[in-house]
């Protein structure tokens, strides 16, 4: 039986993506040997470490857990959902190191909408982004993805720029308009 490792970071407030992941685990277990490596953005043990992990987009604790799971479970494929922020983008280096195939399920357009520093680049000449709801009147110049925080928005932009490179340089199947 094929082995699938499902990889996900839960949001602070449970929503549609977390519920979809739970349902997919149940469905996949009917046909595959499935194990899940689930992180939670509610579990922050050291805020200073998390800030460093944010800035370098690599969480050594999450990487170690994934490394152990890859060595013990030996999956045929890793099925990736949300990596923001606890899991981090460091997982892709590990998957490459282990020569492990992976599939990414994109539940939203955060990686696309959040990768620009300036709102003009995000909106691409439009007054409204149909993917995320951002409107040109939301901010003056900066692409403030999180309306309540410039800092969180900046951290997201750093993350999304790297995530977009990963998507661009991987064999990722996308549906385009």
Where would I find each of the regions flagged by the language model?
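Short acidic/polar active-site loop segments enriched in Thr and Asp
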Residues: 76
């Amino acid at each position: 039986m094929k082995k699938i490792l499902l990889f996900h970071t839960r949001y602070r407030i449970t929503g549609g993506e977390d519920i979809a992941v739970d349902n997919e685990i149940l469905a996949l277990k009917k046909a595959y040997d499935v194990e899940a490596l689930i992180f939670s953005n509610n579990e922050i043990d050291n805020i200073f470490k998390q800030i460093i992990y944010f800035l370098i987009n690599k969480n050594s604790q999450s990487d170690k857990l994934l490394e152990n799971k890859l060595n013990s479970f030996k999956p045929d494929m890793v099925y990736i959902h949300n990596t923001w922020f606890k899991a981090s983008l460091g997982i892709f280096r590990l998957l490459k190191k282990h020569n492990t195939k992976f599939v990414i399920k994109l539940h939203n357009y955060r990686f696309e909408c959040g990768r620009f520093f300036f709102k003009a680049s995000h909106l691409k000449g439009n007054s409204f982004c149909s993917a995320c709801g951002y409107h040109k009147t939301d901010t003056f110049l900066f692409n403030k993805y999180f309306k309540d925080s410039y800092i969180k928005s900046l951290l997201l932009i750093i993350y999304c720029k790297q995530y977009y490179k990963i998507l661009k340089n991987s064999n990722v199947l996308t549906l385009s308009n």
